[in-house]
Each structure stands twice: as C-alpha cells, then as structure tokens.
Amino acid sequence: MSNYPEPNVIPSKEYEELIDAYKLMHKDERAFMGISLIPLTYIIKSIFEENKVKSFLDYGCGKGLLYTKDFKKADKGSKYPDLKEPIQDTFGITKFSLYDPAYPEHAEPPTKQYDAVISTDVLEHVPSQDLDWVMDKIYSHATKIVFLNVCGAAAIKTFPEGKHKGRNVHVSLFDNEWWVNQCHKIRQKHKHLKIYLTWQSTKGIVGTCIKGEEDGTTKSDRSSDKTAG
C-alpha cells in the first residue's frame, strides 16, 4: 500500500445533510451492517485472485460486521452464500481498510492506495451532484482494480426523521447504461484501472468490466451471473 494525497473536494450541502441522516440511522444496530457484500463474496474473491490483489479498501462499508468475529449476525438466510469465516479470511487477504463517513468506527478517511477498492450498495446513496468526486476518490485509492455494485431500484428504507424524513435512502437512481457511461467518464483520469461494475437482474448478478486496450481505447465486457474478467 502506498501513500495517497487527499484531493480537495467540497461536498454539497445535501451530501453533508445525508451523512448526518445516515449517522442517525446507524444508531439502530441492525442498520447498514454490510450484508450487500455477501452475495458478491465469491465473485470478488475470483476477481481478486485473477488480478493478484494483495490489499483492498472497502469504501462505504457500513458497520463492517462481515469483517468481525460476529460476521454470522449479518448472514440473512439461504439466498446468500453460507460464510464460514470473516470476509477478509475468505478473500485470503490480511491488508485491508474499512471506510464509511457515517459510522464513527470507520469514519477516518483512508490515506493510502490499495491494489483494489470495493464499494457495494454505496453510490446510489450519494446525491447525484456529488457522484463525480466520490467516484474519483474511490478510483484514486486503487492501483489495479475497482469493484462497484449499484442498485437501480428504490430501497426498502426511508429516512426516519429530520429534513429528509420519508425520502428513500437510494437518492440516485439511474439505469445500468447510465452507470456504465459514468464509470467510463471517471476512468478517463485513471486509465490504468480495471473497473468492474455489477448490478442485480432477473438473470442474477450482471456485470461489465471496463478496461484499456493496447491502442489506448476502452472496452466493456459483459456477462451475466458473474463478472467479466
């Protein structure tokens, strides 16, 4: 892992308001445990192995319960893989960091770069006007790959109180093609990276891999029920 210079960004007022709202929601011990990572576990493990990943950052990890001895508390039933050990042990990686600006235990901004950054069920929680700088920040922490998972549908949760009471917590809803184009756009500053973008569909987990070609262009490889390599 190498040192990382923190970029100068000015979050929108809405971003700061929503972070405060998520902090309040985190007081419920059942909220944002990090379970969205569970169905993606073995997809990510395969990608890590293929790209020889030795270190990673989970950006927007929530409570990060899957990384603790209490990982089983986040296992929500048979539709998910049956985890036998904390997720970093499943990946076989000891060098990792957790970051979530709305959870005090993981709120310290990362200061290093990692082989990989993963961010699952995060970007749809970010106001649309802040997506460019948040994604640029995610990309900037990676030296090899970025793995993103997004949802294009409304969440079950709404904000329970405050200015945004009743608003769905998925504040940025876009179709899959929009996200692919957005990933391409942000990658223009990070052309050395492979970007793995996945989302849920009726066929399972569908994904695309955005990577550079020898002629300097980019391409997207798509696959269903797994992520392209």
Annotate each PLM feature.
Residues 127-131:
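Short N-terminal helix/helix-N-cap motif within the alpha/beta-hydrolase-1
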Residues 144-147:
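Short glycine-centered segments of the SAM/dcSAM-binding site in methyltransferase folds
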Residues 122-125:
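Hydrophobic adenine-recognition pocket in adenosine-nucleotide-binding enzymes
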Residues 118:
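A conserved beta-strand element that flanks and buttresses the S-adenosyl-L-methionine
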Residues 1-114, 132-135, 141, 152-156, ...:
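Conserved N-terminal segment of class I S-adenosyl-L-methionine
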